[in-house]
Structure formats: C-alpha cells, structure tokens
Amino acid sequence: MITDCTTPSLPARDPQGHKGTFGTVVIIGGSLGGHSEAPRMMLGGPCLSARAALRAGCGLVVLAVPAPLAPHAIELVPEATVIPLPVDASGMLQPSAVAAALDASTKGANAFVIGPGLGLGIAAEQVLLRLLANTEVPVIIDADAITLFAQAHDAARDLRTSAVFTPHPGEAQRLAQGLELEIELGFIEGNHAARRALTTRLAQRLGAVICMKGAGTLICDGLHMWSTTRGNAALATAGSGDILAGIIASFAAQFCMRNATARASEHSQPLTLGEATALAVEVHARAADAWA
C-alpha cells in the first residue's frame, strides 16, 4: 500500500552553522570523447550539478572529473574543490586509480551525485559499481549512471547504500528492462497511472527512491509517494536534470545527515531521503515557475 504524502517544508537553517555544518556533496562526472581532430568534452553537466548544490545551501562541493577537464572545471565552479581523476592515453577513466583518488579525497562526503556527462564505457561502470558498494551516504544516480546501472550484471545491482535514481520515462523503462520487470514498453509517456505504477515497482525492487521526471514528477521510496503539479516547459532544456540532481544531493547532505539528529531539537527534524528528494523537486519546479 502506497501512502500519498505532501511535500515537507524547508527545514530551518542553523543560524550558528558554518560550511562544515551544511554538508559536503561530491559530484562525479564528465568525460572526454570524440577523436583527436574533433575532441569532445562533456563537462557542463557535473558543473551545473555542483553550482546547483551550492545554491541549494550545502557547505562544500567536491567536483571529481577526468584530469584533462580539471582546469576548466575550476574556472567554471571556482567555489568547488576539484579532484582530477586519472585517465589513460585515450582519455578513459582508470578505475583503480580513480578509486584511490576518491578514497583519499571524499572521506567527509555526506552525499554523492554520479552520472552527469560520465559516459557509458566499462570504466565508468566500474567506477559507479565500486562507489555503490563502498559508501554509506546517499548516492544520487543520474543521467549516464542510470544507463550503466541498468546494463550491469544483476549480482552487481544489489544496492548497499541509500540511493536516489532520477530517470526520465525512457531511462525508467531501461531500468525496468535491466531488472527484468514486465512492463508495456512505450506506454508510460503521458499515462499517469502507468508512470505511477512503474515508479512504485522500481522503488520497491531497488529499495531506493525513484524520482520519475516529467510533467508531474513523481517520487516514491517504496512506501510513500510524492508528486508536484508545479513546473513548466522551461524545464524542458539541456541541463535542468543536472541541476535537479545537485539540489537533491544538497538537501540530502544538509537534512539527511547523521548529525542532523543532534540539531533536531533546536532547529528541525531531519528528513528521509524521499522527503528530501520531494522537497528538491518542489524547489526546482518553483524556480521554473518564477522564470516563466
């Protein structure tokens, strides 16, 4: 039985807080593509996520991108700490070296985003699966990371950490196929009941929060459902999903942290990961309405 819930209010911000109080978000993304005569850099997505996380109130952002992109990332998001991820001669990530770099630099992380601009290679998949197997804080699985997860061997898809998946309908169907859930392909676009049913099934199968993006975004944690009627077609543009992922991670870092409980009596109760995601969706949608 799924309980429909209202979006929670934004928790009070600790007036005595500092940048360490409000959590650290790590963004893992970006990739190098193309060929030597026409190189292609995929850097905008993770940088948008990083800027959104900061604007949504987290104290610190760490931006982990392929080493050749690191100087550009610093220019685009000077507030962030940038980690250059080792790559081979072809520009592909080196998973073991990436793991060492992340382990050394992200010990204080309160939430991760992985996927924006990451690419779909086997090295990126290995980085994703290792992160999911070795972290205890929320991970927002976005963009390319959703496809990588859907393609991974079933044994590797047993989540060991709390996670939020942020699929659009096409990615949601890809996830369902990878998980061998029986659905009618191509049926959920514009069909609220079908979208709701698939969102619920994915959340329950994965034991994760599913944020099904689209007109009337749905959020489900397997027991509770949130939705919004806000937002408009201004969100139908490249980068808006990267921004949402950053906001979700920022709220998870601020309001779902273990040490949030210590401040609860004086300021506000911590949120569940589903509540933090629903609140992020509402803020994202209201921002679009403000611009319309």
Locations of regions flagged by a protein language model:
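Small-residue (G/A/S/T)-rich helix-start motifs and N-terminal tracts that mark the onset
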Residues: M1-P138, T147-V164, P169-A292
